[in-house]
């Protein structure tokens, strides 16, 4: 039982990246996550942020959930039935001013939350012949890029976002998640 009395909920200490100005909190909300998961998602998030945004200070929360939690959020916020692999909830649009202090009054801006679904990610990794940690890293990168304003609604935007994901993942030593070696993409 956690300090707030909720079974299964566990907050990690906020960790400020030495690579970027990103402060990351990992919240284990639900699901059977490996002990190494916190480090996997932190590494992916900080690298995505460093590549896409630079060294500006910011905070984000990564929520480790299960299919039931993500299905509930998916229905409530997107009107869609069932779980998905990752959801992103931006706290505010990050204006491209180059100086977040000017917009956020000196406070560290909160990017938002990235919520991951354990069972869906495991199922997809198996179906697509990917390592679980690699697929988890990809979806974490994907979620962080959404918090930074990237989307894939139009083909040109999808191409740009996927290229950025490929570059970030290559830096992390992870194969192209959209390549021919991964069916189902």
UniProtKB/Swiss-Prot annotation:
GO terms for cellular component: cytoplasm. It holds the Pfam family YbeY. Its cofactor is Zn(2+). The keyword Flavoprotein does not apply. Binds 1 zinc ion. Keywords: Cytoplasm, Endonuclease, Hydrolase, Metal-binding, Nuclease, Ribosome biogenesis, rRNA processing, Zinc. GO terms for biological process: rRNA processing. Zn(2+) binds at residues 142, 146, 152. Belongs to the endoribonuclease YbeY family. Single strand-specific metallo-endoribonuclease involved in late-stage 70S ribosome quality control and in maturation of the 3' terminus of the 16S rRNA. This is Endoribonuclease YbeY.
């Amino acid at each position: 039982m956690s300090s707030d009395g909720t079974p299964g909920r566990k907050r990690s200490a906020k960790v400020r990246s030495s690579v970027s100005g990103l402060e990351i909190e990992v919240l284990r909300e639900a699901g059977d996550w490996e002990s190494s998961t916190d480090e996997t998602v932190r590494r992916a998030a900080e690298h995505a942020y460093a590549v896409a945004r630079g060294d500006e200070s910011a905070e984000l929360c990564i929520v480790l959930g299960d299919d039931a939690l993500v299905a509930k959020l998916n229905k409530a916020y997107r009107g869609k039935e069932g779980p998905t692999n990752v959801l992103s909830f931006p706290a505010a649009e990050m204006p491209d001013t180059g100086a977040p202090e000017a917009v956020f009054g000196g406070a560290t801006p909160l990017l938002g939350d990235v919520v991951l679904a354990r069972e869906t990610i495991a199922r997809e990794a198996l179906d697509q012949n990917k390592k679980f940690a690699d697929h988890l890293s990809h979806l974490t990168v994907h979620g962080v890029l959404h918090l930074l304003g990237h989307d894939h609604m139009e083909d040109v935007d999808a191409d740009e976002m996927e290229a950025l994901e490929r570059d970030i993942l290559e830096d992390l030593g992870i194969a192209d998640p959209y390549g021919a070696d991964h069916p189902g993409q």
